């Protein structure tokens, strides 16, 4: 399927809810209004959408929110989606707070991957930016995902003055775990949310800082299935790392021309 800009669209990003159990300062203003329940797509309608998208060439589906596990019946929806499409690449983006009880179900249905958002390894700062004291639960669920063998990527919004001092901790996590740790440039998300130039930490500056910690080698980007992240392997004094570093640069280096996603 090609759009009006002749981009090859084969990836569906489907938001199952706009509701979330966290109140991240860069995402939520605290004054938001939610879509009325009767106006939100029913799961049956989403299943029909996926069917139609696959008929048009979509090969990969990512389910997002809000927080998808905050919507009742989401795990059951994933089970039905997998049963209907055994070969479909199905992924989920989550904040990691509510996924725990569903991990064995996700393993059983063969969920392809999880993107998990975590901006800090500090409990106090986690509560500061999310408004919730759930850091321990997220770390517990990260370990459970690793134990279950479900591939996941760790996404962190990079912010000067907030988590730039934690770069060594993020790099160390990537060195010792077989996952991609990806930094996303801080960008404006809407009226009333926290954003300023002083907090912006560009992808090139992050990469320079990482090079002061470990050796990095760029990974050749996939032409068809590659996402917006530029990936790097890592090596330290004790040898190569188990994971990789990713940089996503919506502000300093736009990737819209290569976008392969339909967002609903």
Identify the meaning behind each predicted range:
Residues 4-43, 55:
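Canonical Radical SAM [4Fe-4S] cluster-binding loop centered on the CxxxCxxC motif
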Residues 14, 79, 168, 204, ...:
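Active-site phosphate/pyrophosphate- and oxyanion-stabilizing loops and adjacent acidic/basic residues
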Residues 22, 123-124, 254:
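Glycine-centered loop/turn positions within well-structured domains
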Residues 32-36, 122-129, 190-194:
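A short acidic, helix-capping loop that chelates divalent metal ions and anchors anionic groups
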Residues 40-43, 132, 197-200, 204:
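Short, conserved loop/turn and helix-capping segments at secondary-structure boundaries
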Residues 43-63, 70-184:
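Radical SAM/AdoMet-radical enzyme domain recognition
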Residues 155, 182-185, 233, 246-248:
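Short, conserved beta-strand edge motifs with alternating hydrophobic and charged residues
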Residues 190-264:
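Accessory C-terminal segments flanking Radical SAM cores
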